[in-house]
Amino acid sequence: METIFAQSSAFGKAGVAVFRISGPKSLEVLQLLTGRKDFKPRLMYYQQIISPETNELIDNAMVVYFKLPNSFTGEDVVEIHTHGSKAISIMLINTLLNIDDIRLAEAGEFTKRAFLNNKFDLTAAEGIADLINAETIMQHRQAVRQANGGLEELYNNWRNQLLKIIALLEAYLDFPDEDIPDSILNDVNNTHKNIVNEISNYLNDNRRGELLNNGLKLAIIGPPNTGKSSLLNFLMQRNIAIVSNIAGTTRDIIEGHLDIGGYPIILQDTAGIRAESTDIIEREGIKRAINSAKTANIKIIMFDAEKLDLSINNDIIDLIDENTIVIINKIDLIEPSQIFPIEKKYKCLRVSVKNNIALSSILKNIENIAENIAGFTETPYITNQRHRHYLKQALSHLMAFNLDNDLVLATEDMRMTARCIGLITGVINVEEILNEIFKNFCIGK
């Protein structure tokens, strides 16, 4: 196995930069850079880092040696903690590149080696990637659970039950003359039925985990000049949308990313929806607004309190569902006692975006809907499409399983089911899958 290295911290100015070396020559490289031979594992040392070629001092650093298998990768590992200077990073990287039998690591190669050395399964490796990319508290919680074996335990439980079924069926095939109690086949059928139900229910999760990973789309829609762009600017705490009294100012979808209550929200301000527009570009914007609303996880429908009765049309009303927040804006311009017909049918929030009236209620409603859609629960959810793909394949093999037909075919269905789940956890190793997963890591991880 080659020895690899990379800067694990971000390149640039910082208090500390961390370099990681992994492989059989790690300790030898550390000894070469420091001129010191006696390094005890897991102890930090304050050492000068010197170029072996020029004898030039690169930096005074803290270094530590991890002896295999007690390291992240399961190999001999060295970490060098220097000052976070671009010049130091460049000098140390060039120095390491000039040492024989050591090369720059590929993206995700340290984590890939840890997986190959059985430090964790493939779902945990993906959890580490999600943890690195997590931007909100809820994404962090989901990633931590997965990185610490939450999904591995679930999938391995199913696979172990399947392996027991396979063992029983193979024994039945290998010793056909032996009397095998009917109770064993009944147990096989019952276990099969339970796994079918569990995987079916697990797949029927409305993609909660994937939505939490990728972000929930929130579309702000409504008639022109109701304050949609002003609301977007308020939520983003900066002006990313043009605000104007001229109808049709927003013609395309404007997008921003936000953390509301720990949930990743992708905000979309859309063109005002009105039936009478003759402008070709505006009509295309209206079409996109409606399509955006139809695919959104959360919708905010805004109306102008002064023009509410005139602005309601079926294109807008038809979009209202349980994940919709109906807002009546500009309430400072009407009498508080005024009640609109739409308020009798739907729960509406009365706000004034311009004067910052009741805007906190919008944030709370968004958070409540996001929690209902993708809230963190005790049961770990499917977090990416790869898992869903193989679970669907596993379920199709389970549905084909039938002990009343050919027992050989039934056994093969069980093998294929176990294989699909093994592909998720990495028990069954396919190089193409590994390359696809680990290429999404940053270099140094």
Swiss-Prot record:
Instruction: Report the Pfam families cross-referenced here.
Output: MMR_HSR1, MnmE_helical, TrmE_N
**What is the enzyme's class at the highest EC level?**
hydrolase
Its Enzyme Commission number(s) read: 3.6.-.-
Q: Which GO terms describe its molecular function?
A: GTP binding; GTPase activity; metal ion binding
Q: Does the keyword tRNA processing apply?
A: yes
What are the binding positions for Mg(2+) in this chain?
A: 229, 250
Q: Any idea which positions bind K(+)?
A: 225, 244, 246, 249
Q: Name one GO biological process term.
A: tRNA methylation
Tell me which residues bind GTP: 225-230, 244-250, 269-272
Compartments where found: Cytoplasm
Per UniProt, where does (6S)-5-formyl-5,6,7,8-tetrahydrofolate bind? Answer: 20, 79, 119, 445
Q: Which GO cellular component terms are attached?
A: cytoplasm
Query: Subunit structure, briefly?
Result: Homodimer. Heterotetramer of two MnmE and two MnmG subunits.
Stated role? Exhibits a very high intrinsic GTPase hydrolysis rate. Involved in the addition of a carboxymethylaminomethyl (cmnm) group at the wobble position (U34) of certain tRNAs, forming tRNA-cmnm(5)s(2)U34.
Q: Which family does it belong to?
A: Belongs to the TRAFAC class TrmE-Era-EngA-EngB-Septin-like GTPase superfamily. TrmE GTPase family.
The protein's name: tRNA modification GTPase MnmE
Origin organism is: Rickettsia typhi (strain ATCC VR-144 / Wilmington)
